[in-house]
């Protein structure tokens, strides 16, 4: 199962209807928790997800609305008796803050800290890129390797059936038949998480060609001066990011508390997002990952 669970959508100040940040990506057997702000543990309960589903925690930067929920989440994992390793990724410059937060949680969890200081691969399929915020900040990108989808009619025409199908998949060639002769390319799915940044090259690299992009939408286009001052994206810039990367679906979040209704922000995004599907997130949304695409080949 692949699903994106929205736990909180506010930025610096929570509101009556929006909790601080928190997002859980359920990706087959893994659960990647992004930027757990205050109240994340309770939001998980309301969303119907379990702390035991978390296998990896990814923090973009150490501003409080992106990490102050960490002790509660870790304590809940200990309480629930989580036995599997939990990997925690964060910018190396914020290690003192992260270690202080971790120290507040009960001991006993197999927690493995992975500070990173440059862009690149930080785990199999998971990479980071530097963003442009007031402190060191990184976005995350998850990439599934490409695969092949077998075509039954081509297998039948080639006379391949039963155990030979598995052999062909493993070896790539069987009795003169190549795997690519009886299949089409199945591009791996791609996900990107871009928070707290002004427009920058790192954000563009993260968003490039992804099926699902989660991006901040802190300010309206009318408040571009504030966005520039605090190094955040405007709605229009979020749309540009999606259009430039040919993104499939864009989920907007991290809304300023000054906007009670965010639909006008979504409208500003859509005006510049090209063919990208645009969704304004609400707390406790559960969004199925977009269906994988199949390419002829």
Outline where the language-model segments fall.
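Divalent metal-coordination and catalytic microenvironments
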Residues: 4, 35, 44, 61, ...
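Binuclear metal-ion centers of metallo-dependent hydrolases, dominated by the metallo-beta-lactamase
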Residues: 200-297
């Amino acid at each position: 199962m692949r699903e994106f669970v929205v736990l909180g959508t506010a930025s610096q100040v929570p509101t009556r209807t929006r909790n601080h940040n928190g997002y859980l990506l359920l990706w087959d057997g893994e659960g990647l928790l992004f930027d757990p702000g205050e109240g994340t543990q309770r939001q998980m309960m309301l969303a119907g997800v379990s702390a035991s589903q978390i296998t990896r925690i990814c923090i973009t930067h150490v501003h409080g609305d992106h990490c102050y929920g960490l002790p509660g989440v870790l304590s809940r994992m200990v309480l629930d008796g989580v036995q599997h390793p939990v990997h925690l990724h964060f910018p190396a410059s914020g290690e003192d803050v992260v270690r202080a937060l971790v120290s507040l949680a009960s001991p006993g969890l197999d927690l493995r800290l992975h500070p990173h200081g440059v862009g690149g691969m930080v785990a199999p399929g998971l990479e980071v890129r530097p963003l442009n915020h007031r402190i060191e900040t990184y976005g995350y990108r998850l990439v599934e390797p490409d695969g092949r989808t077998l075509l039954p009619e081509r297998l039948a025409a080639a006379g391949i059936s039963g155990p030979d199908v598995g052999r062909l998949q493993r070896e790539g060639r069987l009795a003169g038949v190549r795997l690519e002769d009886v299949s089409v390319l199945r591009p791996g799915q791609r996900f990107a998480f871009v928070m707290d940044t002004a427009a920058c090259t790192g954000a563009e690299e993260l968003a490039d060609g992804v099926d699902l992009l989660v991006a901040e939408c802190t300010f309206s286009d009318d408040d571009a001066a504030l966005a520039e001052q605090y190094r955040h994206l405007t709605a229009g810039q979020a749309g540009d990011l999606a259009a430039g990367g040919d993104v499939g679906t864009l989920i907007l979040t991290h809304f300023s508390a000054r906007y009670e209704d965010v639909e006008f922000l979504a409208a500003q995004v859509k005006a510049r997002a090209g063919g990208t599907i645009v969704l304004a997130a609400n707390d406790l949304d559960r969004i199925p990952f977009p269906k994988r695409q199949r390419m002829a080949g």
